[in-house]
Amino acid sequence: AEQCIALHPDLVVVAVNKASIAAVSTEWLARGFAVLSETPAALEEDALRALWQLHRQGAKLQVAEQYWLYPTLAKRLAAVRSGALGTPQFARLSVAHGYHAVSLARLFLNAGQQPVRVTGRSWTEKIIETDSRWGAVHNGALVEKTLQQHTLEFAGGGTAFLDFNGVQYHSYLRSTHTSVQGERGEVFDDTLRCLDAAGEPVCRQLTPLPDPLAAAAAQAGLNEDETAIACFLDRMQGYLAGGAEVYPLADALQDAYL
C-alpha cells in the first residue's frame, strides 16, 4: 500500500475477491484516491449504502460494469435506443449472470431506478465441459452446472426474462442470446426487424458502432471482455477530470442489490 501511495496514482483499481471489494474500495477512498472497483460493488446491503454515502460526500468511485460496452451488446443497445422498436417491452437475455444481467435488462428496457418485482428459480444441468478460461477441454468430462432463470417485472411496464448457466461463458455447446421486443419491432441477436417510416417491414443486420478504441482492441486480438474494460478505463479519464460518470454508481449499486 505504501508503495502505491508514494506513486500518487490518478486512480486505484480494486480487483480482489468479491467478499473484500467493498472494504478495500472504502480503504482507498478514505485515503483520498479515486477508485474503480470490480463488480459487484459489495455483497451486503449495508455496505452498498455505505458506499453510496461516501459518494454523496464527494468520494470518486466507479464500478467496472462493462457488459454494455461489449461491441456486440453495444450495437444491440444502440438499436433499441434508436427508437426503432418503439417502447421496449420485453427483454429475453441469456448472455450473463447476476448483476451483469440485471444491468443489461435495466438498460435495454430503459428501466432506470424503477421499482421491480423479482422471481426466479434454479436447476442443475449436466453438460460435457468443452472450454474454460484457460483454453479448450478435451477430456469429455461430464459436469454439473446451475441454470438460473429470473423474471424482472418493472413498475414502468417492462419485463425481463433472464436465463443463464455459467457454462455459457466458456462452452462450444451453449451459446448466448439477446432478444428485445417493442410494439414496432425486435432485436434478436444481431438482427433488427422493424417498420420503416412508411410502415413497411424491414430486416437488417446490425453493424459495429464506430468506436476507434474498440476497433483497435479487436485488431490487437483482445476479446470482448478485454475490449469493454479497455473502453471503460479510457472513459475514466473524463470522469477523473470532472466529467460524467462512466456507469452511474447508483445503477451499479442497484445492480448488486437486485
What are these language model-derived features?
Residues 15, 150-157, 180-183:
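Active-site beta-strand termini and strand-to-loop segments that position acidic
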Residues 3, 11-14, 59-60, 231-258:
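C-terminal helix-rich "cap/oligomerization" subdomain common to oxidoreductases
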Residues 71-90:
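Rossmann-like NAD(P)H-binding beta-loop-alpha module
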Residues 168, 177-250:
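C-terminal glycine/acidic-rich active-site capping loop/insertion
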